[in-house]
Amino acid sequence: MTDAAPNQPVNESQKLSKSFEPAEIETRWYDEWAKRGYFDAGRHVETGTDPQPYVIQFPPPNVTGTLHMGHAFNQTIMDGLVRYHRMLGDDTVFVPGTDHAGIATQIVVERQLDAQKVSRHDLGREKFVEKVWEWKEQSGSTITGQVRRLGASADWPREYFTMDARMSRGVAETFVRLYQQGLIYRGKRLVNWDPKLLTAVSDLEVQSEEVDGHMWHILYPFVDGPQTITDQDGNTVTLRGMTIATTRPETMLADGALCVHPDDPRYKHLLGKLVELPLCDRNIPIIADDFVDPDFGTGCVKITGAHDFNDYACALRHDIPLIVIFTLDAHINENGPKQFQGLERYEARQAVVAELQAQQYLVKVEPHKMMQPKGDRTGVVLEPMLTDQWFVAMSKPAPASTLNPGKSITEVALEAVADGRIAFYPENWATIYNQWLNNIQDWCISRQLWWGHQIPAWYSEDGQVFVARSEQEAQEQARAAGVAGPLTRDPDVLDTWFSSALVPFTTFGWPEDTPDLRRYLPSSVLVTGFDIIFFWVARMVMLTMHMTGSVPFKHVYVHGLIRDADGQKMSKSKGNTLDPVDLIDGIDLEGLVRKRTFGLMNPKQAGAIEKATRRQYPDGIPAFGTDALRFTMAAYATLGRNINFDLKRCEGYRNFCNKLWNATRFVLMNTEGHALDGDGGELSFADRWIVSQLQALEAEVERGFADYRFDNVANALYRYVWDEYCDWYLELAKVQIQQGTPAQQLGTRRTLIRVLEAVLRLAHPVIPFITEELWQKVALVAGKRTAGAVASVSVQPYPRANPQAVDAEAEAAVAELKSQVEAVRALRGEMNLSPAQRVPLVAEGPTDVLSRNAPYLAALAKLSEVEVVAALPDAGAPVQVVGDARLMLHVEIDVAAECARLDKEIARLEGEIAKANGKLGNASFVERAPAAVVEQEKARLAQFSETLKKVRGQRVKLGA
């Protein structure tokens, strides 16, 4: 694709600068791409066929957040795929967006208000929400600006914010429809409650942490006086009451029963009897339920239905009263004894334990390790709390009027993976997805926050609820129901993940039946970390399929999490986070220390974090540029594994960018100003070899993208550019340009520029900035761009392997030449010859091959001359055997040292021969191994045997 336009960001008359400076290139080219509309949907390489849609949705980052290493990794993968498919000719759509991030954003703004000694309650809801919008406008563009720094070729006119009017409309429509279908309901349920934020918290946002606690053993006296039981040893024992063990003695104030196992013979005769609830003026019954473990403790537990999830289910089964004894901020309420009312939960624990001991109800206290649930946002210990909440029914069959009648939204989501409409990469994540959906509970979607999508439900004065798209519609429903008077809107907001789950279809205009919705749903692939498979991936599948009948995406590529070099999770509290922009632009040590120690939840950690930072980064972090960071991320992208990020890898890929830059300068110096059009010219075996290797690279890159093996893509590009093109072909090309005929020089110059141009297109999805800058110069010489025309590598056809260009003969010839060069270099190394010391080489073997290779050997092995002879002279000079050739350096040698070297080589060859004979003498190997493998082993044996014969001959010539 070429655009005629006057503005060209490259000075075509200016030579390529001596060094690669990424900062200037990156800013210039990103703005230019966006201005030209290359990122827009419908913009693609013309292939002559109807372009297929290729769609990726951003996992929307928090609007108030900043870029972290996970974003950098995720964006590299997504943008690499989008750029690749754009160059393939697909109609690419890369949809950017940000999430309003209810809890996270509200916490940030509340902290700002706290610093001013103002609470959100002082402001009131309306003013507080205005403050949040102000904060969003101030900071919301930060993360999208950082995403642009990474080169994300997103369709920015489609950018959304999950609280935008169009997105909010889709949220309300989904809620109303699900409610009308009986799949959203309101009920009093036990939920995880954050007493600091005063909101319900998703089960998935609970972090369980092992802590050292205590187990309190408490006596509950029988109302009827002591009772006799037969213990597990058959002894008759008289009990004053039942003893239970608990880690939370303060919750006993809300006990509704004691419970034993129905088959426990010790207590069967006690079922239905009453016990006194210590410290409280009431009695509770002894009941039986299968969930009790008769072998744990005394085999008796207390049932506190309103403050324990297991107890809640048991209480419902047995109609035990649910007594709430905590206020929403975790203080004892009016349902507790007066002496404890108003106490904070941990103060209440101390007071309850002291009173139990004083009244001789406390039997004993033991140390006990326990799992403590904490909110992942605040770190506060969560409280099971019985509250009115809104839920999505996950297992209820959908009614006849829906797209999947008779099936629950969970069932439909499971089927989509089972029948292959959605595929996970790697496959094992499908098992995790299935396990979670098969054990799912109804989803609590209400949050007691002020920032978010307010639930579209209104209440009349007598408590009737009207769920509607607007207050006007709710009023109409109320009038139709004969309800007069004002309506009050539900103050709660929706779980952030509810609106995020609608992104696959609301971003394309749903609930309207838009052309975009029909064309771009489903997305091609979702790229995500495994940590949000449950939060986001499964919920997108459920809601997209229920509301539209389509899967949200065809593939789910699940990548690992970025950790530090020691494998530790990156977190602000550990002080081991890295800001990707700091890797792009660089940061000095003092700036890095300030960044890592600012705003810590625990300021006492600052000293240790500063010390560690100064030790790890004594010189700060150098500027690597975006391309080096992207190449690093791609090279790390193995399927599903966590990534231990090492800064040295960035340094290595920055060196790669420098290598590519310098190689391009060399190629341009040797090709600019030469007429390279047409098909004339003579291709050497080296020219044909590098073109043949290019076909293998193109095939490997295509496989890598298809299999989501970005590490293979990156490694293949690295090996070809560094090892084959730069280290070998450029050196061979120098010889051909200096010593070849005009036809050979033309063939070499053409090969140099054409292969480089193809490499720049191949590498563009991974390293877009440097490839664009270099391609502008290279394409002019390669005939891919005309002077003055505006074009971009980003919309050039992606190279595809051509089997006709594979040349096995040329590959074998260069492999032989490489072996000879390396053999002579090894001889030079063993002789401690300096690079400046050029010595003659005498070569015995196939005359045509050695004569052809002679000029290359002389240049690459730093030889003064190469003489091809029928037989090597009898001289005490070092010799290397390479296939059918014997190569002698014509220098004075230390005979003893050369004998030792040959003895070592003889021992190595004898070892290889013994191994090969062992394999071929093993009947099992010969019978079971593929025929090609057996033949390969025979060929190896023959080669080693022939080489050993020649080396022994050389050893004999040298004598003792």
Swiss-Prot record:
Subcellular location: Cytoplasm
Domain of life: Bacteria
Segments carrying motif 'KMSKS' region: 569-573
GO annotation terms (biological process): valyl-tRNA aminoacylation
A molecular-function term among this protein's GO annotations: ATP binding
EC number: 6.1.1.9
Coiled-coil intervals: 893-955
Motif ('HIGH' region): 61-71
Catalytic activity: tRNA(Val) + L-valine + ATP = L-valyl-tRNA(Val) + AMP + diphosphate
Binding site residues for ATP: 572
GO cellular component, one term: cytosol
Keywords, comma-separated and alphabetical: Aminoacyl-tRNA synthetase, ATP-binding, Coiled coil, Cytoplasm, Ligase, Nucleotide-binding, Protein biosynthesis
CDD domains: Anticodon_Ia_Val (cd07962), ValRS_core (cd00817)
Subunit record text: Monomer.
Domain notes: ValRS has two distinct active sites: one for aminoacylation and one for editing. The misactivated threonine is translocated from the active site to the editing site. The C-terminal coiled-coil domain is crucial for aminoacylation activity.
Function description: Catalyzes the attachment of valine to tRNA(Val). As ValRS can inadvertently accommodate and process structurally similar amino acids such as threonine, to avoid such errors, it has a 'posttransfer' editing activity that hydrolyzes mischarged Thr-tRNA(Val) in a tRNA-dependent manner.
Family: Belongs to the class-I aminoacyl-tRNA synthetase family. ValS type 1 subfamily.
Name of the molecule in the record: Valine--tRNA ligase
Organism of derivation: Bordetella parapertussis (strain 12822 / ATCC BAA-587 / NCTC 13253)
